[in-house]
């Protein structure tokens, strides 16, 4: 069929497709055409650098394909079945979104499998802002065929359509975290993260590296250690499916003079360290050093703040030939505690108390003339130095 309209070029006009709306195949054609373009338009708006799709001017959308109760993507077209076998005509909203989603995944560089099924389900979730895929697919408008509102856990080894719900579940739970926090532009954020993450993914599995991809897309300072603007919501949503993001670091420690591995015995040893803000702000005057000798009990010494976030600390005298494990702590203004190394006091830096060897000022094996001259003192009668080879 064709559709034509005569118009004044200066005025906007709208084409009306399928005005009668009384023929299943015509309705399927219109639905499939419009809904495929809805997904494409979403890609164009939120992921304009996605490969292929922005410049693709022709893509086959086939309806009335022989069969019932299914639809498919074959790499160059999306295809939909007529009604029958207890199912509706499959060319309708989120089923079309799903099949075009396979095209998004393929052009983005990933395999299909569980990832392709799940990410394709996400297209419908992003557009409808509800978790059920395929309301009415089986002629029941109160039920669908899959749901993003699920408790599926990573790793998943079930059928690919089942495991695909792992990523749609992460999307839906992240959505709920944003909504509950009152983030008004949550739909825009979800589309940005989800659609652009496709280009970062490879393979056909759903794994926690996807969480990192979302965080990278949300990040604003090229440092995931201090979190991202929406870290708490993304991490919470993905954690519900056993795909947490990397732990953020509140405070960072640096050591202007380095970390000693040799401490002078029987006297005070002074160490400098700085406490730097990452995801949190340092609490002034909260720096300390903890240490233990030969695996004994941990003792603490409060450091002296010599400038904002800069400290010196004096380790008390320790006898010679002792192993000293030590670490640094500080408190953030949100009352969280941080240490260097992470995991202290179990993890610690190590040093020994020992006298440093006397530095060598000159080495001469007397086999080569290094240009020294020997002058014997007045009255010397024997034992003068001579270089001999």
Give the label of every model feature segment.
Residues 1-3, 13-15, 307-311:
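Glycine-centered loop-to-beta-strand initiation motif
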């Amino acid at each position: 069929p064709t559709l034509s309209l005569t118009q004044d070029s200066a005025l906007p006009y709208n084409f009306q497709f399928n005005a009668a709306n009384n023929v299943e195949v015509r309705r399927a054609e219109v639905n499939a055409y419009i809904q495929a373009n809805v997904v494409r338009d979403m890609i164009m708006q939120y992921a304009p650098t996605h490969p292929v799709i922005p410049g693709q001017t022709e893509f086959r959308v086939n309806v009335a394909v022989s069969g019932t109760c299914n639809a498919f993507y074959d790499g160059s077209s999306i295809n939909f079945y007529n009604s029958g076998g207890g199912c509706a005509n499959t060319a309708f909203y989120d089923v079309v979104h799903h099949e075009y989603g396979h095209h998004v995944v393929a052009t983005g560089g990933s395999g299909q499998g569980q990832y392709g099924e799940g990410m394709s389900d996400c297209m419908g979730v992003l557009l409808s802002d509800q978790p059920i895929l395929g309301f009415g697919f089986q002629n029941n408008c109160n039920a669908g065929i899959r749901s993003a509102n699920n408790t599926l856990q990573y790793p998943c080894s079930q059928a690919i359509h089942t495991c695909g719900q792992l990523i749609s579940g992460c999307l839906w739970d992240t959505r709920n975290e944003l909504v509950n926090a009152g983030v008004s532009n949550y739909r825009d954020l979800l589309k940005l993260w989800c659609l652009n993450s496709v280009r970062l993914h490879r393979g056909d599995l759903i794994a926690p590296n996807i969480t990192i991809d979302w965080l990278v897309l949300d990040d604003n300072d090229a440092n995931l250690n201090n979190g991202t603007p929406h870290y708490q919501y993304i991490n919470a949503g993905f954690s519900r499916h056993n795909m947490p993001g990397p732990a953020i670091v509140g405070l960072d420690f640096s050591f202007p003079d380095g970390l000693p591995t040799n401490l002078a015995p029987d006297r005070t040893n002074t160490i400098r360290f700085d406490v730097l803000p990452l995801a949190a702000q340092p609490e002034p005057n909260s720096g300390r050093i903890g240490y233990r000798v030969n695996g004994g009990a941990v003792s603490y010494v409060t450091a002296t703040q010599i400038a904002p976030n800069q400290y010196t600390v004096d380790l008390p005298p320790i006898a010679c030939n002792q192993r000293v494990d030590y670490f640094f702590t500080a408190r953030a203004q949100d009352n969280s505690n941080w240490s260097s190394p992470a995991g202290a006091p179990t993890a610690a830096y190590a040093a020994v108390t020992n006298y440093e060897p006397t530095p060598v000022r000159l080495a001469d094996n007397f086999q080569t003339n290094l240009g020294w001259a020997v002058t014997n003192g007045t009255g010397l009668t024997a034992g003068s130095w001579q270089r001999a080879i």
